Structures are given as structure tokens and as C-alpha cells.
């Protein structure tokens, strides 16, 4: 009988220790997810989810066990964009890919990692400017402004060459911070509304726009770059290239070009499930929760719940080293030639 008491006390101690290490009360985090997820309405009956979470959390022995309880909820919500960062380690629910799909995407995924924060521009035949915008994972204000300014300057440097159109390549843009991306591409977008964040019912939460060359979201001016004059390319035709690695802020940047006049989308749809807007929530000093709380709509309020579609579908191998041999770039040049 005494041994049984020790066992009960030991299990209680393990459970208490796990909860003590987790920097928030698990029930409060669960309730927050349940009532604030943009996908909440997709679960018609929450009782089985409630019961499953209660059972799983009662068996949690470590912080990782506790986080796995929340990942199970994200799985049931089919939410692949939300994730936790605990002491620098990332935890999320990600859909498995078959070996053939992964083999096809692996070179692009690898390149998207090696080219982070490395813009690339060049003049192609026909006076078409090619602009590659990869992931930009910077969040400090000075870094955001530095990258926004750099991208802006990389675009406007072609003013004297009188370009006839642009190709904006987002195929290596798997996410990061959209503020420097959109401000930097302001000369192409113009001073205008770019899109909206909406709740699960499509009601506007906040508006995105370019004002005086800087990105503004919900009235907050997110960048402070020096302008070289009014947007000079806002009326030129633009071909936007996307693919299955384009996601998160890469998808947001694509949406900002949707409904822009004289604009076409070429390639493949963006990564499925990464078109939600994530809020940033902290718990103590060790836990960060990037949580999908809004959908995103373009300037005409068309919502993109799952992915950003293309106008011209081309499923072919990418050739970033020989752009004139790249099937999507060739299609973009052909489309721009007729404009």
C-alpha cells in the first residue's frame, strides 16, 4: 500500500514539474487556441477535441509533452502555419510529403535557405528587369528598414534604363517578414491599398497599404525608408513567379500584387496552408507562439484561405542559374513582350 502511495506521489510530481516548467497554464493556452484560431469554425463539434486534450495533457511529463498536446490540436484544426518557439526550438504541425514531391522540392528548399536576405536583380532581353526576392528573416526596426531600403534601391536603380516591365520572382521566398518586402517593392506597387487581414467570416481586421513609399498596416507605419521620388514603375506590366516553396510572407507579397493592373502570375500555386496572418504571442521569456488569427484578402477583398493561384500554370524544373533557360522566366518574358 505504501508503494502505491509513492507511485501516485511520483506521478503527481512529474505532472506538476512539467506544468511548472511550461511558462503558461496549459488550459489557458488551449482555450486561447480554441476561441481565436482562424480555423475554429472548421471543427463542428469541439467535445471530442476537448476530451482528447484533457486526456493527453494529464499524461504530459515534460515541456515537450505539453507542447505536443497543442500540436495535436493544431493538427485537428489542419493548421500548418502556427508554431511554437520554446528556448529557440521550433514546434509545429507539418503535413508529411511523399518521397517524389520532396525530391522535386528539395533543391528549391535548399536554395531558399542559402539565399535568405540576398536580393538579386538583372536586366533581361527586351528591357525587362528581373527581381528575385527571397525570404527576409529580420524583425528589429533598423534591420527591417535596412533591407527595405536595399530592395527599394535595387529596383529604382533601373529608372535611367527605362525598363518596359518587371519579373518579380518569389519562388525562393518561404517567409519571414513581409514589411521590408512590400516597402522595398513599393516602386512597383505604388501608393495604394495592397490588401486586408480578415476574420474567419471575412470581416476586415486591418488594411495594408503603401503610403509615401512605406508599408502601413492597420494605421501603423512599419518602415521608414528614404524615397528617391514618386513610384516610377507602378503602371508597368509585372509578371510574378510563385511555386510550392513560396509561403507565409512570400504568399503575402504575392497577394499584394493580386488585382494590380497589368500583372500576371506564372508558375505554380504557393504552399498550401500558409496564407494566414500570424499573431505574435509571448509567454514568459522562453515561449513564443506564432498563431494564425486572420485570413488575407487582396485589394479587392478576395480571400485566399489556402494558397495563391497562378494565371499561367507551368510545372517544370527551375533554373535559377540560367534564367533564360528557366521555363517560368521564358513564359514571363513572352507575356511581357505582348504588353
Give the ranges of each region predicted by the language model.
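Short, charged/polar micro-motifs that form catalytic or ligand-binding hotspots
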Residues: 10, 171-175, 243
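Flexible, low-complexity junctional segments that flank or bridge functional domains
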Residues: 20-210, 216, 252, 278-288, ...
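Bacterial Sec-dependent N-terminal signal peptides
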Residues: 1-22
Amino acid at each position: 500500500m505504501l508503494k502505491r502511495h509513492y507511485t501516485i506521489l511520483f506521478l503527481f510530481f512529474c505532472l506538476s514539474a512539467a506544468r511548472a516548467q511550461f511558462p503558461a497554464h496549459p488550459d489557458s493556452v488551449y482555450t486561447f487556441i480554441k476561441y481565436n484560431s482562424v480555423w475554429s469554425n472548421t471543427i463542428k463539434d469541439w467535445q471530442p477535441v476537448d476530451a482528447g486534450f484533457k486526456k493527453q495533457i494529464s499524461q504530459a511529463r515534460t515541456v515537450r509533452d505539453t507542447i505536443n498536446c497543442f500540436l495535436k490540436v493544431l493538427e485537428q484544426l489542419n493548421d500548418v502555419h502556427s508554431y511554437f518557439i520554446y528556448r529557440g526550438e521550433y514546434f509545429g504541425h507539418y503535413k508529411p510529403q511523399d518521397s517524389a514531391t520532396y525530391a522535386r522540392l528539395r533543391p528549391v528548399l535548399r536554395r531558399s535557405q542559402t539565399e535568405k536576405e540576398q536580393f538579386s536583380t538583372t536586366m533581361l532581353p527586351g528591357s525587362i528587369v528581373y527581381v528575385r526576392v527571397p525570404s527576409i528573416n529580420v524583425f528589429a526596426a533598423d534591420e527591417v528598414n535596412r533591407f527595405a531600403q536595399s530592395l527599394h534601391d535595387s529596383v529604382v536603380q533601373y529608372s535611367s534604363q527605362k525598363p518596359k516591365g518587371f519579373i518579380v520572382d518569389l519562388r525562393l521566398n518561404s517567409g519571414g517578414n513581409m514589411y521590408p518586402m512590400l516597402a522595398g517593392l513599393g516602386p512597383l506597387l505604388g501608393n495604394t491599398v495592397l490588401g486586408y487581414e480578415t476574420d474567419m467570416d471575412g470581416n476586415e481586421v486591418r488594411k495594408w497599404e503603401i503610403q509615401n513609399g512605406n508599408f502601413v498596416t492597420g494605421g501603423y507605419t512599419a518602415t521608414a525608408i528614404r524615397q528617391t521620388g514618386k513610384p516610377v514603375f507602378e503602371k508597368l506590366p509585372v509578371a510574378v513567379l510563385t511555386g510550392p516553396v513560396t509561403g507565409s510572407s512570400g504568399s503575402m507579397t504575392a497577394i499584394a500584387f493580386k488585382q494590380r493592373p497589368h500583372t500576371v502570375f506564372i508558375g505554380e500555386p504557393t504552399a498550401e496552408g500558409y496564407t494566414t496572418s500570424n499573431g505574435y504571442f509571448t509567454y514568459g521569456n522562453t515561449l513564443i507562439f506564432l498563431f494564425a488569427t486572420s485570413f488575407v484578402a487582396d485589394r479587392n477583398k478576395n480571400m485566399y484561405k489556402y494558397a495563391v493561384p497562378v494565371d499561367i500554370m507551368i510545372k517544370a524544373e527551375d533554373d535559377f542559374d540560367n534564367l533564360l533557360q528557366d521555363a517560368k522566366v521564358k513564359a514571363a518574358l513572352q507575356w511581357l513582350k505582348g504588353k
